[in-house]
């Protein structure tokens, strides 16, 4: 660009800003006190998260007994996670089948609702009891905690799990195996109940469709405390006479309650409820009526609760703390009773003050609780209100709603401090220090953001693990783990002390912020927590995102071009309260159109020749500037040439001629040399050599061998028994030489023969030859060598399958001396041995799979086999030891009796036959159940000594007349009695038949809803639960189910010896929808 105006425009466009303080802002705004906020970016290094594809609604969290794993329940999934880093151990999909979903859709429910939402997740020993909504057909399973795919049992979820994912519920499992659940028991949610099932005690529930017991409750939590089981919930206040309002309540039942007798059968006789008060004191108190969550500290008998205002009022939340003794005091006080609907609610003395679940020892009501059954039916609501520990809530905040809480007890430098963690409906965790004394207040220490900026969602679950000081948060799409001790976040002493964090203090020895456990000395550990921390409101500015690229214009001298421009603002955030302005450009410019311009010419290049005519070159390029984005290209040539040295003549040319041919190699083999030559033309001053050499015929010469003829036989001065020896010689030489004449005599070969003196046997040369060096000489007294005797054969190298053995001899009998002949023949001899194959011992094959059990009940057996074929025994090897067949017992449980007892034998009929009958006691017999006849007959058996009665005929006419009169009278009498008996019998039969039909219908429906035999989640039997939908009115439901108890309450569903106290609260934070059902 050219010109001063263009340069100034460029500087302003690029936004070269100096660092400067912002303009003065409102001092009052910058001096307000706000609590510290830990952003998602700041908490990121400590945060651990778990996500799974297609898994949402992580609303159930619990720990294994060893506190090494986190068990998570989400929609259609169960997970096992490592506590350390939330890494996945096991994932199990638990989804509804298509038939159940279609049935759910047919009832008008959405695809989102017709899923399996996990709402009960309880750990007992090494088992996991879990229930899901299963598309409005709740079902429960008992699984192995170490392998979630291993299902031990499956039962109906009715009265244990809500039908709808929007219904609030709570459940706990006691040490004796009883399951206490508070939930809606029907599809539309009109029948809420507190229900006990499983275990050894009979099933009980709250009174059905009685608003004085439960009036549209929203269940929050439950706890097993002493002799009682406590439930916390909120409901429409039945005692409130003016309008409709919601009260929060504690309720309790005795764990040894077995229900009433004749009155309150199958119903709690110890159910009582009171009201919890959490309010802001004043001339007109401000009430927080709706309980949202609780947390129980068993060591201190304290129950923390979070309360909010009604959803239709201004959002406000509070935390109140209740002592268990205050709740017990309310239950020991008077009742609040209303005689009838037109009467007022009045206090009534408690007939059983300080009731501790005592039972009757004798009489008609033995084992029943001490409460009078009529009192238990009338007196439900307590008169006194449970007041919190302090008159002012421990913590209050307007314009927010809390949904979940957890409490940790921390040892500070001087005292124990209670830290409250509050989950909000917009996805943050507020860390609150409870009041240190009655006169002091609470402090909001910090607020932790679990999502990036401008994103939020409600918290689904909150669990604290005190042993590891860790907080686990269940959210819609993931699970988060937050460490409670983050002292290393504070780098300086002022930041550490100023944070007012009860977990942290400054260690003067280590010069860093540590927890009390990490400090080297408590006397050198400094902490100050009497005041509340405040947030530094100074905010440095930060740029927001760039705007999209847009066209803009620019001036280049007299030409106008186009560019692309974008800008950004210093508003994410804007500088506040003395913060620095943003550093960097606020505008960027790119892709500006530009006309091309020539660079200056380069210098002329050197002449292309040193003599004679040559040429020179100079160049320029269109890069000053280069044309861009549609700009004009340069006009003209980018290269110029000119002649040079046109008047400078060149001298004669001196040069080498070409190389001549290669001369003959100096050697035919073994490496020689070749040469070639050239000559210098037009003078003697050519650079370089005129001769060039290179090797040739480098291949090795062939091996030559030369042998001399034998010399004549010459006698040797050695005599033996009158004879003499003669010998002759010859020499052999070999080498790789190009000329055979270059060979020299090498190794000498000698032959000797023995000639007898008499000439009879001639001369013999057997074994008398050998090779000697040319320099070798013979002694005058040579001694020929002789072999010693063979040694014994050595041990065979193998015991079987063809081995080798050897034997030796030595040339020392005698040794050859003075040029004597050496021993001829081998000194070592080999022989094969043990050629038979090795024996093969038999080895068992692997066991086959266990066969199916031979019987389904009453004791059967499994069977598995193996064979001695891996390998089979051979060549005398041992056979396999052990059994080839194994059996094991199975299905040893007693077969269920399907027939009733046989009736007594009937009276003999006219044909002399007796009959007896039996009935099938199963409603739906399967397999071999109820096989056989329902009746059985046999001939009558008479006693041999029995004499039948014989009537003797009388001939007297008087007697005959008397008998006739007697018979006629008695005949009419007997006819009247028989007729009346028949009518009475028919009436009784009709009454018994009607009663049996009604009883059988109830048993049939209840059995269909809750089959006695465990069924699969997706079996057709569980689909019969939908029969409830044919009842459209409350009256019809009442007629269908008198007390709505489940028939399958048997101890087989959960082992009471493996369970501990476990709680599960199904509670949700969508406060705008919790009352929709």
Swiss-Prot record:
It is found in: Membrane. Residues 540-593, 595-651, 653-702, 707-765, 784-839, 841-896, 897-944 form the TSP type-1 domain. GO terms for cellular component: membrane. Residues 35-484 form the Sema domain. InterPro entries: Plexin_repeat (IPR002165), PSI (IPR016201), Sema5A_sema (IPR042821), Semap_dom (IPR001627), Semap_dom_sf (IPR036352), Semaphorin (IPR027231), TSP1_rpt (IPR000884), TSP1_rpt_sf (IPR036383). Residues 22-971 are extracellular. Binds PLXNB3. Disruption phenotype: Mutant mice die between 11.5 and 12.5 dpc. At this stage, no defects are detected in the development of extraembryonic tissues, cardiovascular system, axonal trajectories and peripheral nervous system. Mutants display decreased complexity of the hierarchically organized branches of the cranial blood vessels. Mutant mice are viable and fertile. Belongs to the semaphorin family. The gene is Sema5a. This is Semaphorin-5A. Residues 993-1077 are cytoplasmic. It is a single-pass type I membrane protein. CDD domains: Sema_5A. The chain crosses the membrane at residues 972-992. It comes from the Eukaryota. It comes from Mus musculus. Keywords: Developmental protein, Differentiation, Disulfide bond, Glycoprotein, Membrane, Neurogenesis, Repeat, Signal, Transmembrane, Transmembrane helix. The keyword Glycoprotein applies. In adult, detected in liver, brain, kidney, heart, lung and spleen.
